[in-house]
Amino acid sequence: MPLAALKIPPGVVKPATPLQAEGRFWDANLVRWRAGKLLPVGGWQRISSAPLDSTVRAIFAWSDLGNNPYSVYGCEDKLYVLTASGFTDITPAGYLPADVGQYGGYGASDYGELLYGLDYALRDITTAVRSSNVVTITTATPHGYPVGMSVLIAGVTDTSFNGTFTIASVPTSTTFTYAQTAANASSSGGTAALPVADRRPQNLLYAQSFSWTFDNWGEDVLAVASSDGRLLHYNVGEPVAGPVGTSAIVNIVRVANVCTVTTQDHHGYAVSESVNISGNSFGAFNGTRTVTSVPSLTTFTFALSGTDTTGTGGTVATTKPIPVDNRAVIVTPERHAVLIGAEGNPRRVAWSSRENYTDWDFASTTNTAGFLDLDTESILIMCAPVREGTLIWTENEAWLMRFIGLPYIYSIDRIGFNCGLMSPKAFATVAGRCIWMGKENFWIYDGGVVKPLACDVGAYVFDNIDPGAGPLYTHGTENGVFPEAWFWFPSQGSTAPDLCVYYNYQEQWWGIGSTMTRTAAYSAGVYPYPLASDEDGNIYYQEDGWTAAGLPIQTDRYAETGALNIQNGTALSFVRQVLTDSGYGYDSTQLTFFSSFTPEGSETASGPYNPRSDGYTDVRVTGRDFRVKIASTKDAEWSIGQMRLDFVPKGGR
C-alpha cells in the first residue's frame, strides 16, 4: 500500500483558490505552528468584572520597583488604570475626547482637510479672569469660536488658566467663557486656539486617526492623547492623571517663614524654579513662588514671612513652558521625554532636558532640551522604540532618531520612503525590531534598514480591509508569549477590528483569524499573558486557557489545506487511512476531506473522521484532487505533525 507523505510547510498562503495554494494551508482560524507541528491558539479570559464605558484604543503596562504590575487603558472618552484594586477612572480634568477632537476649518490647512467655517489661527489673549469658577477670556481680535467647541489655552502667565476647555458662552466677538473650579484670579498673555491634532481623511487609504501613546518614566507614566494634545503624567495612587508641571496640593505648612508644600504626586520641580499656586485654603499662599529646596519627590519649599499656619488644597503649576497640542510621546533610554508633532507643529520632534520631563526650555544653555523640525513630505504620525533609537513615521516615510550627545543631543535621518503606517497603531515592536502594516503591504525595520516584509496573506488583508475604518482602527502588538506580531483590522463594512493576521518572526510564517474582535492589545511581559480589549469594553488575558471567556471555541479553530498533490492529480485514488503524527490531544481533533474529479469540479466532503489513539484514522475518500481540514473538537491543547495517506491507485478514470 503506497503511503503519500503530506509535507505541508507551516503557515497560511491565501491566494484566490485552494488549487493555487497547492501543497500549503489555504485557510485557517486561530491556529499556529511550532517546530512544524500544528497547534491551537490559546483562549481568552475576562479580567474586568464589568465593561469599561468607553472604547479602548491603546493599552500600556509597566511595573513598579516592587515588581507590581499596572496597566493603563486609553479610551476614546476616558483613561483608566488597572491596579490590584481593580479599574479606576483617571481621566484628566478638561480632557478633549476623540469624538470632539476631529475638527477642521478653512485657511489653516489643505483643501478638504478641515471643517468649513472655523478659523484655526492662534488668538492672542489680553486678559484671563476667573470669578466664581467661571473663566472669561478676552482676545485681542475677534475669535469666531462657537459655544460647545473645545478651546486650547496656552502660555497664560498664571498657568492655572492653561489647558483644554469647552466654551460655555460667547458674550462678545472678543470674549468667551468656560467653567473651571479654582480660586478667583486674573492674568494675561498666552494664546487661544481650536485643537487640530486630528483631521479628516486626506484619501480613502489614510486618516490621521485618534491615538493614545504611553511610556513609563520609572514608576510613573507619561501620556498624550492626540485629540487632547497635553503631555500628561500619572503616578499610581493619584486620583487622576494631570498635565505635566501641574500637581494637586495636599497641604502647605509654614513654620519659621518656610513654607513646605506637599503634593499628591511627583511634582518634578527644581530649586530656583518659579511656580504658581492657586486655590489653597490659606489665600496668602497663592501666587507665584520660587522653589528654595526639594526635600522629596512630593515636597518642595518656598520662603514667605508670616505666622505659622497650614493651608490645604489647590494646585501648583510650573511657570516654565510645557509643550501643548502634541501628537505622541515616548521616553528614550537616555531619559529624555520626546514629543512628536510638538507644539502643534506637525513636523516637529522635541525633547525635554535629560532626567527632567518638566524642563522644555529650548533657549537655555544649561540644559539638554531641544527640537528639530524635519523636512518631511508629510506630517508626523507615530513613534516606536527600536534597538538603534526611535523610529518615527510620517504619512509616507520612516525616520530614525539617534542619540549623538552634546551639543546636538539627537540626530534624525530619513531611512524609508513610501512606507507609511496603515494607522497610527498598526505596528509591533519585536526584539529591537519593528514590523508594521502599510497601506499596501507589510514592512520591517531591522538593524537600521527598512524593507518590505514578504506576506503570504497580503491579498487577504488588503482585499478585505475596510478603506474607511482601516486607517482609523487597525492596530498591532507583539504577542509576548510566542514570537509573533499580531495585527487586527476592520473587514469591509465593519468599524471594529474583526479580522487578524499574525507573523511568526522566528519561523517566518503567517496565520489568520476571523472570530476575535479586538480594539487594542499589548504584549505579555509585565503580565503573564497579552492584554486585549473588545468593542464592548471588556478586558481580557489572551493565551489564557482554551475557551472564549468560558464560551466554547471548538471547531472555530481549524486549518484547511489547498490541493494535495497525490499522484500529481493524473489518476484517481482511493484514500482509506491517514497516519497522523499527533504529539498529544489526538481525541481533540477531527479530519474532513474534500475530493473532486476535476480541478473545476464540485467538491464532495467526507467525514469528519476522528483519529484513533494508535495514530490511525480510517477514512473512505475517492477522487483525483484532495484537500483536508483539521479542526478542534474540544477546547483543549493538541498538536498534529506530518500526516501520511494510505491510498490505492484507481486508474485514470
PLM-predicted stretches and their roles:
Residues 1-120, 203, 211-213, 418-653:
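Beta-sheet repeat architectures centered on beta-propellers
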Residues 15-16, 90-211, 238-324:
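Small/polar beta-strand repeat architecture
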Residues 43-62, 201-207, 240-244, 320-473, ...:
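Beta-propeller and closely related beta-pinwheel folds
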Residues 68-70, 219, 388:
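Structural hallmark of WD40 beta-propellers
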Residues 72, 123-130, 166-170, 211-215, ...:
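Short, exposed beta-strand/loop patches in secreted or surface proteins that constitute
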Residues 79-80, 229-231, 346, 398, ...:
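Structural signal for beta-propeller blades
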Residues 143-150, 267-269, 273-274, 339, ...:
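Beta-rich globular "head" domains
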Residues 217-234, 239-243:
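Hydrophobic or amphipathic alpha-helical targeting/insertion segments
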